[in-house]
Amino acid sequence: MGLDIPGATGSCPDAAPLDESGAEDLLRGICFKTGPPRTVGVELEWLIHDRERPDLRVGQERLDSAVEAVRALPLSAALTFEPGGQLELSSQPAGSLMECVETTAADLAAVRATLGAAGLAPVGLGVDPWQAPRRRLREPRYEAMEAALDRTGPAGRAMMCTSASVQVCLDAGEEEPGPLGYGRRWQLAHLLGAVLVAAFANSPFQQGRRTGWRSTRQSLWADLDPGRTLAPGSGRPPREAWAAHVLDTTVLCIRCEEGPWNVPEGLTFREWIRTGSPRPPARADLDYHLTTLFPPVRPRGHLELRMIDAQSGPDGWLVPLAVATALFDDPEAAETVYRTVKPLAETSGAPAAPRNPLWTAAAREGLADPELRAAAIACFGAALPALERMGASGAVRDTVAAFTDRYVARGRCPADDLPEPGDLTARSLSADQSRLSGPNLLSGPSRLSDRTPPRPGKAASA
């Protein structure tokens, strides 16, 4: 199948070369799609390990067989796999938090059962505590990404092949200013984001050793190519700042129909437009360039919160999903949390996230940092009544409350409870976190694990 690149196979609807002003207009038009917040989504990444011996690498044939079985499931979510074999489920945009929780839990139950039949388990940790990075997917995108990220050190391969996250996707917000305005939500995301890093830090190990970070995953992102992983600079309106950031970030690769993709060094997208070499970029190239940018908050029409480590256990993922949704989408909670985190801007300073003192403290110290602990206590305290106002089930609220009591109130994070890698098992990770939740996620009699997953829909966009 031909790639969607201009000039590769004749005429193409979007093959007209971009000019600079046209690219800026496109970016300003697609990055923040405003309106009252109504939809929510979640993207869950999981490490795949043997249930009994997670320290042993899963053989390729065994993994391929399990992947084939999972692909055959009638999932609602979009199913993809990351370069190191991590499994990712991307939910459909849901009309409410509970709809997102229900459909995602049903998909996960089916995936977990299918992997379990092969003696495998999805493990929720921000970084694989056992395995060294080893890429399984041999695709031009990942060949080019590996080559480009290798220029700044080994963190790129570790991120690609051994990391996993919970990514919460929320509407951009309203055009007008106020608690639900997109400008306020954009600013909130970059301050509250550090609190979420600290509260959900769950990756203290790498290759069998303690790293000194509660979130080793976040430390990896901070070590990568800064243009590709930093937030846009402050001081500009969000649309203008994002458009400039995209155009001034280096191009990871220039796709071609045959042979390896070109991996230029130091060529920004703006310079590519101006020089037109090795070929003029078109709309499809700009769209693809956007998929190679990994800031902690990525505007894709909606806001994609990318800073949260994967969480252990069958229900761990729903806590960051519920908390983030409540704090952004409930007007009362959003106002409270904005006042709570606004003073963190002074600690953050001028550098962009995640390379500023606030985010560094969050990744290294978790909630042992007094300022982040105080902010987290206020934020989680605001989330609980907001969840009730939003119609979250009692079981979901109880799960969030249990996490708050176990970690936030005590200035701890999940990383603080993990045993050394030699004592970790896929079973212990699952059993440990399941104590945070009740037997099901709904207030009614039905159990999510007994529900039949819905038929596939369109690809997830939230």
Residue positions per predicted region:
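Terminal catalytic/cofactor-binding subdomain
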Residues: M1-G156, T162, A201, G301, ...
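Conserved phosphate-binding loops in nucleotide/dinucleotide-binding enzymes
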Residues: E99, D171-G173, P177-L180, I308-W317
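Loop-rich catalytic cores of soluble enzymes, especially ATP-dependent carboxylate-amine ligases
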Residues: V123-G153, M159-T162, C169-R298
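Intrinsically disordered, low-complexity segments used as extracellular stalks/linkers
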Residues: P439-L448
